[in-house]
Regions:
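Active-site charged/polar residues at nucleotide-handling catalytic sites that mediate phosphoryl
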Residues: 107-111
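Short, contiguous pre-domain boundary segments
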Residues: 1-4
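Hydrophobic alpha-helical segments typical of transmembrane helices
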Residues: 13, 17-18, 100
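Flexible acidic/glycine-rich loop/turn elements at helix↔coil and beta-strand↔loop transitions
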Residues: 20-26
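Structured binding elements
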Residues: 86
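Conserved AMP-binding/adenylate-forming core of the ANL superfamily
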Residues: 6-10, 27-80, 97-102, 106
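Short beta->alpha connector loops at strand-helix junctions that form conserved
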Residues: 92-93
Length: 112
């Protein structure tokens, strides 16, 4: 098992850990989903791209990102991107419709 060492408590977050692993063992698998394989480097790249896009839309530390998506690797990438920014990810059940969906969005008060 590859151990990570963080010099500073501020660096101890999943985004930093993935970046460090991408540097150290980049092509090793991070995620296997169905027939797809995602390496640490690929996940790091995707998470960074999503985080940059979310930041460009104004998502910052402590704000909420609501999303309603079917299960899959993309959900993981989006959640990790929110975490990388220090934002809170709010997954919404894809079965919610009408009042349930409206109430969930209203109560979660997402930035995006």
């Amino acid at each position: 098992m590859n151990q990570l060492h963080f010099a500073d408590i501020e660096q101890r977050h999943i985004g930093r850990a993935i970046a460090m692993q991408a540097q150290a063992i980049g092509e090793r698998p991070f995620l296997l989903a169905d027939a797809r394989r995602f390496s640490f480097s690929e996940v790091n790249r995707r998470v960074n791209e999503l985080a940059a896009g979310l930041a460009a839309r104004g998502l910052t530390v402590g704000e909420r990102l609501a999303f309603c998506m079917e299960s899959g690797p993309e959900v993981i990438f989006l959640a990790l991107a929110a975490n990388k920014l220090g934002a809170v990810w709010v997954p919404i059940n894809t079965e919610y419709k009408g009042d349930w969906l409206e109430d969930t969005i209203r109560c979660s008060r997402p930035r995006i």
